[in-house]
């Protein structure tokens, strides 16, 4: 398992995890499940980002949330809470161990994730996106926004 970095067109440095075959294999089922769940959320534009403008064209106002290094910094503990709403504790604990319990090598150093989860691992983005939707939904409910 290793981490690689590269620059993107927005002049940000991206860190991507390259996991071993077995870790990716066990993560793939959850990855598929979570992405299918995201397809059912009408506000999500993961699969068609161009649809965003047509969804808001008649809105008086809208808010957009952009998080820098979201998968790397968003607490995996929050993602785990969301997953525990659907999966047993032992499953989610095993997911956490596969995601962040095993160290990565980056530039000859051994590193472990302390907060987020590794972009590049199956289920990484989808688990973050789903937890993010839950948080926004909760906030809207608390504020009386439908």
Indicate residue ranges for each PLM-predicted region.
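Core nucleotidyl-transferase/polymerase catalytic module
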Residues: 1-146
């Amino acid at each position: 398992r290793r981490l690689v970095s590269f620059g993107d067109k927005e002049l940000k440095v991206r860190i991507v995890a390259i996991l071993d075959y077995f870790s990716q294999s066990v993560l793939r089922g959850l990855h598929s499940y979570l992405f299918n769940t995201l397809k059912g959320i009408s506000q999500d534009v993961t699969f068609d980002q161009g649809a965003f403008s047509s969804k808001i064209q008649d809105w008086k106002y809208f808010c957009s949330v952009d998080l820098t290094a979201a998968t790397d910094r968003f607490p995996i503990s929050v993602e785990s809470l969301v997953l525990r709403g659907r999966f047993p504790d032992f499953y989610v604990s095993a997911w956490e161990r596969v995601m962040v319990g095993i160290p990565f090598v980056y530039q000859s150093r051994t590193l472990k994730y302390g907060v987020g989860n590794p972009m590049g691992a199956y289920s990484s983005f989808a688990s973050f996106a789903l937890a993010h939707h839950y948080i926004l939904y909760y906030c809207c409910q608390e504020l009386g926004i439908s």
